[in-house]
Each structure stands twice: as structure tokens, then as C-alpha cells.
Amino acid sequence: MAPNKPSVKGKSSSKGDSKTGKPLSSASKVNKKNVKRPPPKEVKSKARTESSLLKKTKKREYTEEELGLPKLNMITPVGVVKPKGKKKGKVFVDDQEGMMTILAMVNAEQEGHIESKLQKARQMEEIREARRKEAEARLAQKKSKLDDAKESIRQKKKRKGGSSEDSAADTSAAASGAKSKGKRKSVSFA
């Protein structure tokens, strides 16, 4: 036999203690392995070709009254309550003549828009023509000034025509004066 540890006086062995103390909690519980359960029930799936699965279920069809849809393109008589989804600017006409007058007013307004566009186009064309004429007038004025200057120079030449040196000097002076006005000084940085 195996040697036992010497027991200390005053203390009892642990084996005796366990029996006299609290009862084991595992004894009161039922072991999960020992419990017998009924076998799981097999769920039988039906074949896809079975007639009950192939049948289409009927969906409920709602009437127009149940849905509360307004009737479209209808002339609502006087005294009839307007539908709940009324748009802004919607005009309810009580008779055919009233509807025709409203239609005529709308058409006239649209024609007015078209006429105003045509009128604007005409005005713009007139403005373009006026600008063209002004530009042509300016060019003609410049040409006339240039021609006048040329004529004045020619007249001066004809008056002084006696001395050739003076006329040469005058023409060179006139040319230098014209060049000085036309030519501008330019500065270049190297």
C-alpha cells in the first residue's frame, strides 16, 4: 500500500469532511448525457413541380374609388368638390365656352411672347445697322479730312511754285511734321 501523509492532530481528514458537509451540487443536477430526448422530426420538403406550389396566388385589385384617384382630362361642373391632389393654377371650367376663352387667352399670351421676341430681334438688327452706318460715316469723315489735308498741301505747292528750294524745304518740313506726329518714341531694354 501507498504510504499516507501523517495527519496533524486537531484536523480531520478531507475525505470525512466532504461526506459530513454540504451535499454535492452535481448530485442534485441531472446530467445532460443521461437525459433522453425524442429524435428531431423530419420536415419533408415538397417537390417544386407539385401543383399546389405552381398555383399563383390572387392579388387583391383595388377600384378607382378605393384608391381615390382623380379623373383626368375632365371638365368639373360647378359645385363639385375639387380633388384632393389639386395643383396650383389649375382652373376648373364649368362650360365649353369658358374653356375656349381661357384657351384663347393663353394662346394670345404665347403669341405675345413670340411677337416680343421678334420685336427684340428687329430692334437688335436696327441697332446693328445704325452702328454699321456710324462706322462708315467715321471712315468717310477720316477720308475727307485726309483729302482736305492733301488738297491744302497741293494748294500751298501751287502758290509757292516759283522757288524750287523753298518748295523742297516746305515739303520736307511738312513731311517731317507729319512724321513727328505719326511716329512715337519707343524705349527698348537690352
From Swiss-Prot:
Give GO MF terms, alphabetically. Answer: mRNA binding
Coiled-coil spans in chain: 115-161
On whether Nucleus is a keyword of this UniProt record, the answer is: yes
Q: Which gene encodes it?
A: loc1
GO CC terms:
nucleolus; preribosome, large subunit precursor
Q: This protein is called what?
A: 60S ribosomal subunit assembly/export protein loc1
InterPro entries linked to this entry: Loc1
Q: What does this protein do?
A: Required for efficient assembly and nuclear export of the 60S ribosomal subunit.
Q: Please report the organism this UniProt entry assigns to the protein.
A: Aspergillus clavatus (strain ATCC 1007 / CBS 513.65 / DSM 816 / NCTC 3887 / NRRL 1 / QM 1276 / 107)
What broad class describes the main subcellular location of this protein? nucleus
Mind listing the GO biological process terms from this record?
Answer: intracellular mRNA localization; mRNA transport; ribosomal large subunit biogenesis
Task: Return the Low complexity bias intervals.
Answer: 1-13, 164-179
Q: Where is the composition biased (Basic and acidic residues)?
A: 39-49, 114-154
**Family note:** Belongs to the LOC1 family.
